Amino acid sequence: LNAYTTGVMFKASLDIATDRVFNESGETVSNPSNWPTNLFYFNYNFYTSVNAIRKLALNNLPGDITDNSTTEELARYSIKRFKKTENYSCYYNYWIKHLDNNSPEMGVMEFGIVRNNIYRLSVNKVAGLGSGEPFIEPEQPDEYKAELNINIDVFPWAVRNQDVELE
């Protein structure tokens, strides 16, 4: 389960193209200072509200899906919410794989930090937009494809021999 899996969460700042943010009228909102606290992402565009998505891109979106819907409810329709703090951020979860069990279901000690090892993580590629919230589904038992391509090097601790004379 993810609740017992060792991983890392990366936080990235979004650099949103100003011609990709739309209001309910379908106009671009090109001045970032006019963007709301929450931006909603759907089908490679950002919207100022869920209602803007409903009007411009997803006409069959149920009326009970609103700006205040949960992350899980929005995800059912491939919508992501990004909250503005100092900027808009996204998050990527990556589980640290120590030993591969060659199964899509997480195995015991497959993901974890093992003592006397050093782990170096190198981000090679960002394959998509991360989550708008720092969220982990603790009950998820299966591995899933991360939006990041990461190279992991595991180095065992080195033994340093020293001669000692006791007097």
Cite the ranges covered by each PLM segment.
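Extracytoplasmic cysteine-anchoring/structural motifs
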Residues: L1-E167
